[in-house]
Amino acid sequence: MWLLEKAGYRVRTAEARALQAHPSLVPKRQARGSPSRCNPNVLTPDRIPQFFIPPRLRDPRGAEGRVDRNPGGRNLPVACSLPHLAGREGWAFLPESPHTRRRESLFHGPRGLAAGLAPAQSRLHVSAPDLRLCRAPDSDTASSPDSSPCGSPHTPRPQSLSPDEASSADTSPYAPRRAPPLFHLDFLCCQLRPTKDSVLRLGPRGGQLRLSTEYQAGPGRLRLRLVSAEGLPRPRTRPGSGGGGCCVILRLQPRVRPGAQRSRVVQSSCNPIFNEDFFFEGLRPPDLAVRSLRAKVLDRGAGLRRDVLLGECETPLIALLPPLAGGLGPGSSLAPTHLSL
């Protein structure tokens, strides 16, 4: 106490200074019965506002002012799995009240659905898949559901149209468009072109090559597909040669452009699978009888090593052609008439 008195501290003086302070610094005790003051945005048990959803107003336009958003008359598929959210035009959307933008209005359904009367156009339509293989030639009338195997939900166009109406219907943005074909016509023709599978024996150490040949007389294109090689001999381990993998070299004799074509390299396999196509252009029908195919199978050298020959063969080109490719084949005459599918 003596030390505090020397420092100038007095107990009574400190209490007097505290009482003389600003009254806002000293909290006042509130009476128990007085209501508590708080922010009006804070919800308390005794202050719960009453939510009010205004009633739906009538549309001033009425039924006459409605605009048909689907002038083409087509039933468009709805991209929604909830039937109660499908509108009258067939689109899936959340209706909004014209007099409020509250979140509660998003859950209000259309009038027809609320009254229990579902509109005829609000049903979900799922169009059947288009199984047409190629595009049919254009015509004035669309295919009817009776003639189509799957039945199209689109309404058919009128069968009789004047020249003016036909021209305007084709250029209209709402004119029905045919769906793209499932398979292109070139893809189907490629499947219908005749091909021939051949097996070439390799010498002198054995093995064979499997080829598939196709010839198009129109552009004069020869396609050789190298499928695989079987029974290749083991590469001899010599210092400074081989060890890089197996590849095949194909060329036509006498040489034509492009010259020798090389396949990809398959590592460490006696039965490599290639599945590669080789094309030779500019081959006329008279040239097929005087040319031959020469194939070489090499063991590629790795780094500075040299290539090692595993086998080779040479076969007349006419023996590899399919029998239906313009009547060409062993023992057939080279006539200028050729079939090109």
UniProtKB/Swiss-Prot annotation:
In this chain, composition skew of type Low complexity spans 139-149
Q: Source organism's superkingdom?
A: Eukaryota
Specify the C2 domain's residue ranges. Answer: 205-331
Question: Which residue stretches belong to region Disordered?
Answer: 56-75, 134-176
Q: Which SUPFAM superfamilies match?
A: C2 domain (Calcium/lipid-binding domain, CaLB)
What SMART domains does UniProt report for this protein, alphabetically? C2
Which residues span the membrane? none
Instruction: Point out the signal peptide segment.
Output: none
Q: Which Pfam families match?
A: C2 (PF00168)
UniProt biased composition (Basic and acidic residues): 56-71
Record's protein name: C2 calcium-dependent domain-containing protein 4D
Species of provenance = Mus musculus
Question: What is the organism lineage in this UniProt record?
Answer: Eukaryota, Metazoa, Chordata, Craniata, Vertebrata
